[in-house]
């Protein structure tokens, strides 16, 4: 695997642990599926392979979405936000995006519904 392009790396703002936020959106629906963490290596792997790769803070290692579950994310595009501290991955989701098996990590707890 190649390293992250220095031109991209220089634009990223990371936290004290060297991580930044990744927001994952489904290409077909525009629905936000999940929020995860990435490090430079995870982003480099994602850009190189188009397989969504994240960094697990609890395990202290990278993980490729769907490698064990089969619930994969094929990356269509990656965008950097205006502050440089968040990337947006637009993906084609196969199966549930959430570790609970739900389609999104935001299916379970509606705190405020639409004002009808």
Swiss-Prot record:
Family matches, as PANTHER family: HISTIDINE BIOSYNTHESIS BIFUNCTIONAL PROTEIN, PHOSPHORIBOSYL-AMP CYCLOHYDROLASE
InterPro entries named in the record: PRA-CH, PRib_AMP_CycHydrolase_dom, PRib_AMP_CycHydrolase_sf
Keywords tagged on the record: Amino-acid biosynthesis, Cytoplasm, Histidine biosynthesis, Hydrolase, Magnesium, Metal-binding, Zinc
Protein residues bound to Zn(2+): 82, 98, 105
Name of this chain's protein: Phosphoribosyl-AMP cyclohydrolase
Cofactor(s) needed by this chain: Mg(2+); Zn(2+)
Source organism: Mycolicibacterium vanbaalenii (strain DSM 7251 / JCM 13017 / BCRC 16820 / KCTC 9966 / NRRL B-24157 / PYR-1)
Co-factor binding comment: Binds 1 Mg(2+) ion per subunit. Binds 1 zinc ion per subunit.
Summary of subunit composition and partner proteins: Homodimer.
Upper lineage: Bacteria, Bacillati, Actinomycetota, Actinomycetes, Mycobacteriales
Function: Catalyzes the hydrolysis of the adenine ring of phosphoribosyl-AMP.
Cross-referenced HAMAP family: HisI (MF_01021)
Gene label: hisI
């Amino acid at each position: 695997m190649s390293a992250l392009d220095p031109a991209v790396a220089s634009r990223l703002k990371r936290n004290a642990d060297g991580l930044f936020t990744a927001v994952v959106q489904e290409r077909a629906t525009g629905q936000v599926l999940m929020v995860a963490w990435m490090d430079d290596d995870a982003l480099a792997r994602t850009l190189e392979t188009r397989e969504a790769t994240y960094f697990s803070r609890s395990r202290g290692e990278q993980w490729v979405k769907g490698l064990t579950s089969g619930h994969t994310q094929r990356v269509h595009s990656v965008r950097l936000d205006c502050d440089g501290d968040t990337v947006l991955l637009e993906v084609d989701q196969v199966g549930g995006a959430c570790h609970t098996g739900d389609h999104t990590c935001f299916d379970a707890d509606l705190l405020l519904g639409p004002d009808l």
